[in-house]
Amino acid sequence: NKLFQLPITYYTEADQWSNSPGLRADKIVTDKPVTSRCLECHTSFAEAISGPPLEPMEFDHNKIILGVDCERCHGPGARHVEFQTKNPQEKSAKFIVNPASLSRQLQLDACALCHGSNLKKTKPSFQFTTGKNLADYFTISSLNDNAVNNGNIDVHGNQYGLMAASKCFRMSQQL
């Protein structure tokens, strides 16, 4: 029930294989664990079965749905699906988060879960959902200027921090 990252990844847009994010080009690593922090963004329904609550190490692989899905941005959907299935004539979505109805900060928090790498957990994994305040679940570190200046930001770079630090973003109340 432990998960490990493959050392290479196929990028469909580029139609090529490359080193997986976070791995060095000069060393093949086959034992890099996939952590709960990875699963919070890249799966749904990950359920920890062992390890400390902040960083469990084993997961029920029968329940995990791989990839980014609707729940990442719209919150838990079971009640929504159940209601809409029983009420197909209802055209107004019920029991689901419409990100457009959230405050600017809550919209940003939903994105920052996966696009703000400088997050340190303060509550157990898999508790944050869209519509909640990210700061209640994570300590949000400021943008690391050294990483920006040295070009050390990869796919897991702090896109949220980069955007929030931009003049355009700071001068606007819109997203």
Annotate each predicted stretch with a short phrase.
Residues 7-33:
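Extended active-site and interfacial segments that coordinate phosphate-rich ligands
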Residues 1, 5-7, 19-24, 47-175:
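Primarily the internal scaffold of c-type cytochrome electron-transfer domains
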Residues 1-5, 31-48:
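N-terminal export/assembly segments and adjacent metallocofactor-ligating motifs
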